[in-house]
Amino acid sequence: WQRQVSVRNDGNAGTGAYKTTATFVKPNFLREFDSFISSFEIHNDSDPEIGAIVASTSYSFPLKNGKRFITSYAYGEREYVEYTDSLRDISFKTHHILGQFEKTIYSSKNQAWNAFVGLNINRTDSYLSGVRSDLVVGASDKGWVRTGHLKAGLNFNGSYKTKSWSGSIYGMQGINGISEDFQRADFAEDGIIPGEARAVGAKGNLAWTIKKGVGLNLGMSGQIAMNPLFNSMTFGLGSNAGIKGLPGSLTSGDSGWLGTSELVLTTWQKNKKAFQVVPFLGAGGVHTDLKSVTTKDAVGAGGIIARFIQPEFVLEIGWV
């Protein structure tokens, strides 16, 4: 088994700034070339009170002719423990199921392209003082909503001399029949029709070793919605999306963009130990069109990180 534990202070507002994650990976779990991943995440505030718990598993099963099937399940609970007003009585439970086929369509010494198509199903239950309540779009007065969508596209990665890159191009299509009748009626009040929700997007990352001890990492992504989307199809901004110095999930919208950059300066290195200074900058924006109402938001952050690398752990201290 391969194990990794991380402790960070870029959790989400309300559920707690401190985020502890434990990840376990087992290659060749049931057969050769398969893999099993299990992850546990806890958010807490400084009291400490637990504001969120997320548990997930993923299994990748190799098929013939460069094909793979990936299935995953995630369960989460969220409470706003940092607040002292009525928001503290709000809580959510979420389920996410994914089934995805992948196929390697091109592979060479320095690059690879994979095609994928996956089915995503999500359910959210919302509560006010422990009673199911209409707190999310689509939930109606029954207090729960289920949605599903297809996502298909291409993943790619490659390298050449001092540069390496990766990214994806994708399209998403909502599925009408996964939501209940009362949920579709609730969505319609906001101009959302699950079966007509669709979007396209792309993302890319570039790592460039400029010279010994100096590296540059760049990232860009964007999404365009053709019609109003439900929550699981939206474009999110925060540290989970790559913008360092922000809460994990700060804002989201149907369409959006983001860009990130960091300069990695390795000031000392010996064997497998190193000390790095990393200035970083990131920004993004989102917007949503619902009937005659348009909402927009933009965020950004910049700062510097001191990173100490040991064979068994990595320590980062940052200023934003």
PLM segments and residue spans:
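Outer-membrane beta-barrel domain signature
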Residues: N9-T15, N44-P48, T84-I90, V137-V145, ...
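Transmembrane beta-barrel architecture of outer-membrane proteins
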Residues: K19, A52-V54, T94-L98, T147-G153, ...
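Residue-level signature of outer-membrane beta-barrel architecture
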Residues: K26-N28, F61, K103-I105, L154-Y160, ...
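Transmembrane beta-strand segments of outer-membrane beta-barrel domains in Gram-negative
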Residues: S60, R68-N217, Q223, H287
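C-terminal transmembrane beta-barrel domains of outer membrane proteins
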Residues: D186-V320
